[in-house]
C-alpha cells in the first residue's frame, strides 16, 4: 500500500469462497477510498474474478510466466550498452508511460533496476528494464523500434541482460497469447512454467 500515491498492489492468495473475497473487497473499499488497486491472481479462480467483474474492474490479458532454464545463444551484443547520462533523455522519451514503473521511477530506483539500451548510429532504438537485487530477477519491460526488432536486437538485449545477471536467475511474465514475444524469450533460453498463469485486474475504489 502506497498511501501518498493512493495505490495498492495485491497478490491474492488461494480462496474458493466468493463470500470471503467479497468481504475482503468490502474492507478495502471502506478503508482505502479513492485508491487504485491492482490485483494479481489465478485467472481460473472465479471466486475472485466474479465479484470484480460485477464491480466493473478492468481485466488485463492473461499472463504466462517464463523462467530462464537453458543457456542463451552466443550472438553479437556490441550494440547493447548500460544506461548512462548521455542516453537518459532519449530513454525517457521512448519509455512507456502507461505503467507504474515509468522511466522516472526506474531512474530513481537504480539500486533495484538495471537498464540496457540498444544504441545504433547515436540513437536509442530499444531498452530493457530488469531487476538487479534478487536471486530471481524479473524483466519488467522490453521495448524495440520496428527497425531494431527486425534486426534481432531484442535477442541481443536479453543475452546481455542474462550475462550481467549471473549468477542469479531471471524470469519474465508475458501475455499468454503473445506468440512472437514467447518465441523471443524461448530463443534466449526461457521456458514456460505451466500452471502458473496469472491475470492482473485494476479496480478504482470510489472516493
Model feature map: region roles:
Residues 24-74:
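Hydrophobic alpha-helical segments and helix pairs
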Residues 38-48, 171-183, 198-205:
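Conserved beta-strand-loop-alpha-helix junction that forms the acyl-donor binding cleft
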Residues 1-32, 120, 125-146:
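Conserved donor-binding loop and adjoining core beta-sheet/short helix segment
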Residues 50-53, 184-186, 190:
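Conserved active-site tyrosine of GNAT-family acetyltransferases
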Residues 17-30, 144, 150-163, 183, ...:
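Conserved acetyl-CoA-binding loop-helix of GNAT-fold acetyltransferases
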Residues 58-70, 173, 191-206:
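Conserved catalytic-core motifs of GNAT/GCN5-like acyltransferases
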Residues 63-64, 70-101:
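Short amphipathic alpha-helix that is part of the acyltransferase structural core
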Residues 95-124:
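Active-site rim helix/loop that mediates acceptor-substrate recognition in acyltransferases
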Amino acid at each position: 500500500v502506497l498511501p501518498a500515491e493512493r495505490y495498492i498492489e495485491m497478490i491474492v492468495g488461494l480462496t474458493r469462497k466468493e463470500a470471503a473475497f467479497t468481504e475482503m473487497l468490502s474492507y478495502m473499499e471502506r478503508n482505502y477510498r479513492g485508491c487504485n488497486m491492482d490485483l494479481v491472481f489465478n485467472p481460473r479462480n472465479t471466486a475472485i474474478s466474479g465479484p470484480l467483474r460485477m464491480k466493473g474492474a478492468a481485466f488485463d490479458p492473461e499472463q504466462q510466466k517464463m523462467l530462464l532454464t537453458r543457456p542463451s545463444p552466443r550472438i553479437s551484443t556490441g550494440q547493447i550498452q548500460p544506461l548512462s547520462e548521455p542516453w537518459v533523455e532519449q530513454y525517457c522519451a521512448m519509455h512507456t508511460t502507461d505503467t507504474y514503473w515509468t522511466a522516472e521511477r526506474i531512474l530513481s530506483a537504480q539500486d533495484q533496476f538495471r537498464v540496457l539500451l540498444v544504441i545504433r548510429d547515436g540513437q536509442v532504438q530499444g531498452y530493457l528494464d530488469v531487476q538487479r537485487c534478487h536471486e530471481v530477477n524479473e524483466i519488467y519491460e522490453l521495448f524495440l523500434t520496428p527497425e531494431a526488432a527486425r534486426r534481432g536486437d531484442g535477442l541481443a538485449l536479453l543475452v546481455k541482460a542474462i550475462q550481467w545477471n549471473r549468477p542469479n536467475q531471471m524470469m519474465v511474465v508475458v501475455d499468454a497469447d503473445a506468440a512472437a514475444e514467447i518465441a523471443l524469450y524461448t530463443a534466449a533460453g526461457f521456458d514456460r512454467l505451466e500452471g502458473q498463469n496469472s491475470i492482473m485486474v485494476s479496480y478504482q475504489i470510489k472516493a
